[in-house]
């Protein structure tokens, strides 16, 4: 992808994924804070132009699904002849009408390291403590879960 500036690259990349990639379910975009503050129009244009049901800035796109409350589904416009990533959405806890997309934004660098990162050193411990909490809910299990995370 040829571009002479970061803002132009963002537009070229947006056009590429919209026009050349299959599916419309989710997209993740890494945007450094400095670029966001220096090029707010380019970032907003990217978010507006992306034809995906979920757009996550600096976050894993699966997080939009895992949160359960945001609407999750393919971008509107799919048909039975070209279903792409599906028709309609799931979750939508707040019963929002005619949702085009969910946009989720977080920091470029996360602390503590999210448990879904492959490099998280205690993900098995976190998962075990989370299952224990689900099995026998108790406020007393939370400190151990938080310390493992």
Task: Label the predicted regions.
Residues 8-9:
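Long hydrophobic segments that form regular secondary structure
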Residues 4, 20-149:
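C-terminal segments
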């Amino acid at each position: 992808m040829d571009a002479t500036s970061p803002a132009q690259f963002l537009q070229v990349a947006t056009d590429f994924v919209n026009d050349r990639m299959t599916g419309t379910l989710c997209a993740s975009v890494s945007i450094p804070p400095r670029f966001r503050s220096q090029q707010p129009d380019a970032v907003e244009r990217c978010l507006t132009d992306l034809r995906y049901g979920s757009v996550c800035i600096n976050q894993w796109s699966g997080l939009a699904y895992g949160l359960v409350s945001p609407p999750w589904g393919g971008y509107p416009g799919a048909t039975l002849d070209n279903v792409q990533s599906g028709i309609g959405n799931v979750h939508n806890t707040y019963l929002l009408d005619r949702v085009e997309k969910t946009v989720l934004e977080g920091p470029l660098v996360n602390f503590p390291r999210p448990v879904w990162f492959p490099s998280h050193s205690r993900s098995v411990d976190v998962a075990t403590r989370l299952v224990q909490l689900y099995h026998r809910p108790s406020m007393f299990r939370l400190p151990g879960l938080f310390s493992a995370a």
